[in-house]
Amino acid sequence: GRGNSIKHLRHENIISLLDVFISPGEDIYFITELLGTDLHRLLSSRPLERQFVQYFLYQMLRALKFVHPAGVVHRDLKPSNILINENCDLKICDFGLARLQDPQMTGYVSTRYYRAPEIMLTWQEYDSAVDIWSIGCIFAEMIDGRPIFPGKDHVHQLTVITELLGSPPEDVINTITSENTRRFVDALPKREKIPFQQRFPNANEEEIDLLEKMLDFNPKERITAADAIQHPYLAPYHDPSDEPVANERFDWSFNDADLPVDQWKVMMYSEILITSEF
């Protein structure tokens, strides 16, 4: 049953739904291994040395390479839900929760910076490529020490993206279904792409190359986790024999049900009980 599917989503670089605990008072707690800090706090204290940037990026991609083939998309990746301990082990948390939130409701700032342009441009159709965009933003922030696209609101968010990447390409504009959005995009000043080398003078060629592949305006052209992890930049860590892929599609169908929150708790609870028996 579903318990099985969750069990298969156990992975070293992910804090899974199995670590959720529901108290008798119906509060949901997340039991996380005590990981010393998160990437947001780490980045605000000091610049990261290149070997750490590489190792952290590698572990994030290793997690995505595992879950994406199972049809699981995080949708809300940002430095504060990337947990890191003193051995530099990295785990992504809040997988599965992003699904419970209506993307239009999560307008708070920290998330917006890392949100892929197609989420703002089309709302309906988006897939695992949104996670790659978010990781690209986090990668840039690890290199540069500050958020790459600090938008003040939705509109400004798209503007700061076009200031670096240039105007959205035709094939992206053609996917926009909302007339209002289309008008907004057409009204944006036409911009040329700024060379990444110019924007990130401290980055080396391999970093620039991978970053450009992750921050592609077009989600269909954006590099996948499986391809990104094989990029020469990550060669020091890449080990095909130690990068598992989830072996079945994950059943999130219960997430689409329109249920009151207290019922959610029960469902999640039963999922976890089924699984912990194994």
UniProtKB/Swiss-Prot annotation:
InterPro entries: Kinase-like_dom_sf, MAP_kinase, MAPK_p38-like, Prot_kinase_dom, Ser/Thr_kinase_AS. A motif (TXY) lies at residues 106-108. The modification Phosphotyrosine is found at residue 108. Its cofactor is Mg(2+). It is an enzyme of class 2 (transferase). The TXY motif contains the threonine and tyrosine residues whose phosphorylation activates the MAP kinases. Proline-directed serine/threonine-protein kinase involved in a signal transduction pathway that is activated by changes in the osmolarity of the extracellular environment. Controls osmotic regulation of transcription of target genes. This is Mitogen-activated protein kinase HOG1. It comes from Wallemia muriae. The lineage of its organism: Eukaryota, Fungi, Dikarya, Basidiomycota, Wallemiomycotina. The gene is HOG1.
